[in-house]
């Protein structure tokens, strides 16, 4: 008996019922044939590392999702339900997926593992986190301090100084024996401790695509170390995302993820805003962030001292190595995020919301996302608020495609339907719609049937006219013949009975008509002929 290889794609097909249930929980519907097509043929062409057999790697799934949700002609609205379902399976894996999902790496430092050998390929780069590649330029190794207890090693000579504040000593305490590494002209062989050093770290494992380089990161002795943003990541973030004025929601989501995962300092935040925003956009964001500062009573305040203390415009003297400094940075990042959200809201314009209509080939789920984004951008209302669900539902019905909107309006007990119920019904209608080829065939068939009915009607009317003309002519001929017959019969009845010796001309007795003295004598004229009406006349 041979063994079959289990892949993520085959695993989902074996548990297709669970996949459909997960998709239903996401208010979308999926079909097995399109599931296989997108996984094995479409997504591998996006160039983000998606294998033909599928994967449960969240980083790759998110990159495919960004391609699918791309605005304009580069997006793939028909693939939205399928990548959303993949993401849900990988984010909250069911029992049959958990054995195939690699455990999430912890952010805290762990004991390094001796690599099996140097990797010949560069480490994969994430679209979000900055990563550092090992240096290939030979240089003499620096003196390193080793600890007896096998703790992680920090290279003090290669660490950059922090942007502000004094950093405490990074060497472990204790008066144990110290060893000094020998200097050579070649790059030292990899070791467990060297893998901790910046610029000399080994490439991550093959199944890891997430960089662990954060601006603030715990060092070997439990103290935070500073890791600045790389220029390549800043460049990629700027070029692979729309401007703040064009799509504030997408850029705000990117900055929010950076603020959450990277824990940037005040200087890092200014660098991030200066790279991703224009000067006018940055000033608007900073102004809205300062408006969001709250006083001791929990209400917004305009006191300059409190505003400058929570959200300073000048470089503060916060020390991120102390709890107080970290608390200041956390509050600053929260206010900055609030400023981004408030500055991204356009003036209320319901006409813009009403102008969002469903495209001919756009799925209801993708249309709903565009509609919600319009609510966030052009109104002060939150479409996720339960109090706004009725307004969003009505907009979804009225602005859907005409065929979908008419059927949604005729649903029974429409008032009790939730927005999720409407989306599911719309998906059913959308999936049953006719293709362009079927529509052309239907129109051609209807045109032929209409032309055939027109020809049949013309022939029927022509036959009816011929029959009516025939009947009229027959009636006219019958009338003429009947009149002539009556004339002949009438003349015979008017002729009186004559005796044998009575004249037919003068009605006197004693002679006949040919010998009647009263009858004029002369040549007889031609007898008039009776003309009969024929069909040709």
UniProtKB/Swiss-Prot annotation:
A motif (PTAP/PSAP motif) lies at residues 109-112. SUPFAM superfamilies: Retroviral matrix proteins, Retrovirus capsid protein, N-terminal core domain, Retrovirus zinc finger-like domains. A zinc finger (CCHC-type) spans 501-518. Signal peptide: none annotated. Residues 429-434 are annotated as: Interaction with host UBE2I. One of its GO terms (biological process) is viral budding via host ESCRT complex. GO terms for cellular component: host cell plasma membrane; host multivesicular body; membrane; viral nucleocapsid. Residues 112-217, 433-537 are annotated as: Disordered. Keywords: Capsid protein, Coiled coil, Host cell membrane, Host cytoplasm, Host endosome, Host membrane, Host-virus interaction, Lipoprotein, Membrane, Metal-binding, Myristate, Phosphoprotein, RNA-binding, Ubl conjugation, Viral budding, Viral budding via the host ESCRT complexes, Viral matrix protein, Viral nucleoprotein, Viral release from host cell, Virion, Zinc, Zinc-finger. A motif (PPXY motif) lies at residues 161-164. A motif (LYPX(n)L motif) lies at residues 128-132. The record marks 129-130, 214-215, 477-478 as: Cleavage. The modification Phosphoserine is found at residue 191. It comes from the Viruses. PANTHER family: GAG_P30 DOMAIN-CONTAINING PROTEIN (PTHR33166). This is Gag polyprotein. It comes from Murine leukemia virus (strain BM5 eco). The lineage of its organism: Viruses, Riboviria, Pararnavirae, Artverviricota, Revtraviricetes. The gene is gag.
